[in-house]
Amino acid sequence: MVRELLEKARGLSIYTAYNTNVDAIVYLNGETVQRLIDEFGADAVRKRMEDYPREINEPLDFVARLVHALKTGKPMAVPLVNEELHTWFDSHFRYDVERMGGQAGIIANLLSNLDFREVIVYTPHLAKRQAEMFVRKPNLFYPVVEGGRLVLKHPWEAYREGDPVKVNRIFEFRAGTAFKLGDERIVVPFSGRFIVSARFESIRIYTEPGLRPFLPEIGERVDGAILSGYQGINLRYSDGKDANYYLRKAKEDIMLLKREKDLKVHLEFASIQSRELRKKVIYNLFPLADSVGMDEAEIAYVLSALGYDELADRIFTYNRIEDTVLGGKILLDEMNLDVLQIHTIYYIMYITHADNPLSEEELRRSLELATTLAASRASLGDITSPDQIEIGLRVPYNERGEYVKLRFEEAKRKLRTKEYKLVIIPTRLVQNPVSTVGLGDTISTGAFASYLAMLKEKGEL
């Protein structure tokens, strides 16, 4: 079932933009964490944890947020806004791996390695170091304008000298890692990652003016678009531009992609620390999207920005499925989405309206493909061929699977759901993942691509 659906999806052409970066990965151990705590002192770290810095301006901000992430076992991303800290990080850590990062880059390489018919990736900054991190496959293209025409080149042939490179530092942690914060012994409850995401003025999210007139041609050429990276927009820039300017351009990009046909557009949402920016992204872009993907922390952030603070707090505090379902229904209706996809450690969920062309069984198959691809990636660290889906098929569903199904049925009984199609499946959970980076992107890509493939088969695309 999963194999056949992947085969159908591989016949699609997909456009993805905007964010790529270099991921510098550190595999954390208890000794490294202990060294960092000892350098600053447990009291100073604990006090800064209470302050809960929203961005990293100095090393202690980093250590405090890292220890908080390890203590909760939840994946987190915090922006680094002080460029001078590059030297501190590089002197304190040896990077185990450098590879493609950024949602658009990860998604492009994944689709290309799965042998999709055509993958067009766009990022406004394409330095040689970045371009060389794209896989060298004949189905992967980067759009450029030459002689007044749209030309598709391979990314490694289209780089520009002098373009800036964004480096994100990713600290992978394993469940069971132990260290001490003063007298408190902390054992990490879940595997995950802590991302120090560079947020510098030189890196912006936009489509170059010369390429924008050709977005309708790209939209007509592809079956779907996956857009991401809006968390990289700053509220204000020193040259006078601001978030409103870049979000206006982002809205225009979506409308241009959809101009020649009703192109299905998926937005992959990522945590945005600034409530003001989060609200702007939601209200400007979600109503133009057909599909949105996020995790349970991100849906809580979104609901908070929309004014549903009590519900958001319940999701943050209790992680109850019924609260996530209620929040998903609100978001689906208020933003007029076709489909909302929510992924967590233990389950993946689709929420659509009752008139969605796909049946609940078909939606379930889409999620099965998504979790299987993610299990393959977690097992191997990356997916380099479509055959590797077999690895994911051998990964068992997590031990909370039956509990998830039970709570989901209870939630459906409690809430009015007749106007919706609600589907949930337990995740295939790798106990000791090689890497957790890109798992959410893999889930969303597998889900959206298979969703498109089944729509196309029904003549609905």
From Swiss-Prot:
SUPFAM superfamilies noted in UniProt: Ribokinase-like
Residue positions binding Mg(2+): 268, 298, 441
Record flagged with keyword Metal-binding: yes
Location of the protein in the cell: Cytoplasm
BP-aspect Gene Ontology terms: fructose metabolic process; glycolytic process
Pathway: Carbohydrate degradation; glycolysis
Cofactor dependence: Mg(2+)
One Pfam family hit: ADP_PFK_GK
Recorded catalytic activity of this chain's protein: beta-D-fructose 6-phosphate + ADP = beta-D-fructose 1,6-bisphosphate + AMP + H(+)
Catalytic residues in the record: 441
Highest rank taxon of the organism: Archaea
Keywords: Cytoplasm, Glycolysis, Kinase, Magnesium, Metal-binding, Transferase
Molecular function GO terms recorded: ADP-specific phosphofructokinase activity; magnesium ion binding; phosphofructokinase activity
Function of the protein: Catalyzes the phosphorylation of fructose 6-phosphate to fructose 1,6-bisphosphate using ADP as the phosphate donor.
UniProt-recorded name of the protein: ADP-specific phosphofructokinase
